[in-house]
């Protein structure tokens, strides 16, 4: 009697660094990505930072023989940069924007303007089961100093974990992938794996791995990729920034790209970092990230969902970070509103003073000064301080309210319904 073989899914996630007018050799690199994907036998491909619809169409045309179904997601002013390719029919899809997603005054970052979020799709697998697919790109920390965007990234991790949890509870085959901009076993990582009811595929395949393997400093560049799973800032990547000699042990190489899966419906059989080669003729890496490839085996008989909740310590840590951030942002909001209130009488006074000014050129200078003062007051005081300040603050209040609810549930479950909790 033959034993039925469990079907497998070969999944790829890749941040393609496709920023228009910024990324070098963007068109050539993304075309090379499409050409390489066309030669591979992936079932599902999730791409991030594909900002141009034309780049998406180029890749789609190249891979359409194998990956018949595709979706490009639109969001905000500049687009989400998220794309999906699949062998299986896409029966439903949507773009879910994060409630907290950077600040408009940091226009050079761009996160607020691109409307980052979670691209979701439901795929019809030949077995008749539904694959719930999630593709995302969380807010980057930016810089080596204090991570002022950590609170937003925690909120984003919480938001996607709620979507994942709902899909797992429906019994779907859940796969979430992308550039999460988080370190393994960090607070955002713990939120996703515990409340989202998913496993980190890399840790599923290599359970002994932690954030920094004990023998990390004895590893060469290749081992750091193959064993530690680093996908960003590796010395093997030609786009890595120049670093000083004190970083020779590859301190800055990080594992930021992930594939998460629902352990109740599928099992991670293999995980590896790919797209390590250089683009032919250009002699450069395909992107400033490497890609992560995972092979998942679909369980013929799904097991009951083991419902975990976020631990007390994780909730407390998250609340502490959020309260600290709220205090800072409340101060900034009040200062900006004060700027607006102070500017109003000042603008009126300058307008009155123009009547007593001679010669005419001085009036022009004062009028120009008044215009600039008005623009600064409206943009900084009204738009950023009042409108966005309240927008962000209300988003933070909602985040805190949901965390407090979870804290109460943790206490109630500990008393009445003991459940396995995530490791704190």
Swiss-Prot record:
The active site is at residue 289. It is found in: Cell membrane; Endoplasmic reticulum membrane. The chain crosses the membrane at residues 335-357, 364-386. GO terms for biological process: cell wall organization; ceramide biosynthetic process; sphingoid catabolic process; sphingolipid catabolic process. GO terms for cellular component: cell periphery; endoplasmic reticulum; endoplasmic reticulum membrane; fungal-type vacuole; membrane; plasma membrane. Mg(2+) binds at residue 49. It is a multi-pass membrane protein. Keywords: Cell membrane, Cell wall biogenesis/degradation, Endoplasmic reticulum, Hydrolase, Lipid metabolism, Magnesium, Membrane, Metal-binding, Sphingolipid metabolism, Transmembrane, Transmembrane helix. Its EC number is 3.1.4.-. Its cofactor is Mg(2+). Inositol phosphosphingolipids phospholipase essential for the coordination of cell wall formation. Responsible for the hydrolysis of the phosphosphingolipids (IPS), inositol phosphorylceramide (IPC), mannosylinositol phosphorylceramide (MIPC), and mannosyldiinositol phosphorylceramide (M(IP)2C). PANTHER family: PHOSPHODIESTERASE, PUTATIVE-RELATED (PTHR16320:SF24), SPHINGOMYELINASE FAMILY MEMBER (PTHR16320). Belongs to the neutral sphingomyelinase family. This is Inositol phosphosphingolipids phospholipase C. The gene is css1.
């Amino acid at each position: 009697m033959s034993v039925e073989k469990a079907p497998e899914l070969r999944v790829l996630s890749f941040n393609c660094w496709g920023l228009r007018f910024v990324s070098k050799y963007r068109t050539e690199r993304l075309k090379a990505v499409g050409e390489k994907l066309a030669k591979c036998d992936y079932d599902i491909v999730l791409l991030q930072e594909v900002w141009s619809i034309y780049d998406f169409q180029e890749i789609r045309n190249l891979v359409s023989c194998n990956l018949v179904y595709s979706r490009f997601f639109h969001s905000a002013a500049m687009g989400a940069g998220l794309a999906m390719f699949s062998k299986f029919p896409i029966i439903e899809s949507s773009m879910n924007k994060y409630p907290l997603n950077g600040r408009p005054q940091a226009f050079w970052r761009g996160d607020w303007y691109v409307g980052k979020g979670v691209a979701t799709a439901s795929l019809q697998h030949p077995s008749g089961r539904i694959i719930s697919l999630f593709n995302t790109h969380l807010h980057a920390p930016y810089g080596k100093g204090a991570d002022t965007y950590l609170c937003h990234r925690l909120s984003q991790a919480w938001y996607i974990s709620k979507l994942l949890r709902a899909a797992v509870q429906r019994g779907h085959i859940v796969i979430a992938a992308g550039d999460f901009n988080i370190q393994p076993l960090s607070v955002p990582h713990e939120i996703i794996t515990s409340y989202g009811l998913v496993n980190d595929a890399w840790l599923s395949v290599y359970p002994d791995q932690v954030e920094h393997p004990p023998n990390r400093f004895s590893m060469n560049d290749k081992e750091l990729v193959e064993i530690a799973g680093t996908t960003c800032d590796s010395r093997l990547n030609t786009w890595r920034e120049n670093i000083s000699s004190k970083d020779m042990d590859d301190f800055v190489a990080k594992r930021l790209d992930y594939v998460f899966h629902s352990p109740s419906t599928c099992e991670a059989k293999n995980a590896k970092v790919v797209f390590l080669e250089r683009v032919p003729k250009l002699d450069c890496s395909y992107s400033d990230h490497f890609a992560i490839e995972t092979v998942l085996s679909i369980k013929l008989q799904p097991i009951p969902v083991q419902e975990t909740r976020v631990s007390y310590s994780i909730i407390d840590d998250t609340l502490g970070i959020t309260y600290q951030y709220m205090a800072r942002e409340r101060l900034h909001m009040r200062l900006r509103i004060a700027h607006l209130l102070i500017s109003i009488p000042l603008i009126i006074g300058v307008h009155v003073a123009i009547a007593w000014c001679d010669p005419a050129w001085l009036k022009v200078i004062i009028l120009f000064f008044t215009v600039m003062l008005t623009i600064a007051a409206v943009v900084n005081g009204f738009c950023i301080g009042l409108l966005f300040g309240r927008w962000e603050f209300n988003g933070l209040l909602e985040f805190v309210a949901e965390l407090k609810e979870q804290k109460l549930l943790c206490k109630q479950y500990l008393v009445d319904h003991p459940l396995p909790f995530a490791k704190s």
